[in-house]
Amino acid sequence: MSTDYEFQGWFPFEEPINATIHHVAEVLDAPVSLDVKGNPTFRSDSLLVYSFEPKREDDRDSARTALGFDINLTLVFADYSRGEDTRMIRAVQNMIRSVISLASVPGLHAVLIEEERRDDLILLSVDDGKVTLNRKFEGWSLWPEVLAIVPEPHHFETLHILP
């Protein structure tokens, strides 16, 4: 069983799936392979990283309603550390390191969510280079070593899923 973190958003690349996976794999120094459908993916320690585009317009509409912006990609970080603290912290640090690196891409707009679209499970948002941490996400206080990955000064706000 894994804990899935989804970085959902607008990724301004000509080929979002390929460019995003290769960008993150380079950050984590991991080799990219292809899954059974021919899509790029990779594993780094206990993280499995893959991505997918919205299949139907309904999926995009749902995201637009919940997030307030259009999405063209979901980047998934599946953490298979199974609750082992050291591995889990390292996996989440690597995920945050990857997301922060993507934040520097001009025009990128996305949110990082743990498991489901709930206010308290939003970790952060990225809007054209600006990283905003969710004040309601308990992980920032529980895991100071994860927060340390985010460049200072930290900008906290209360982030919401739209009704």
Q: For each predicted feature, which ranges?
A:
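Acidic, proline/glycine-rich low-complexity IDRs
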Residues: 104-163
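Short, extreme N-terminal segment that most often corresponds to the first beta-strand
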Residues: 1-37, 158-163
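Short, intrinsically disordered low-complexity segments
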Residues: 30-86
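Short, low-complexity, polar/charged sequence segments that are solvent-exposed and flexible
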Residues: 26-30, 93-94, 131-132
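Charged, amphipathic alpha-helical segments and their flanking helix caps
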Residues: 5, 10-18, 76, 80-109
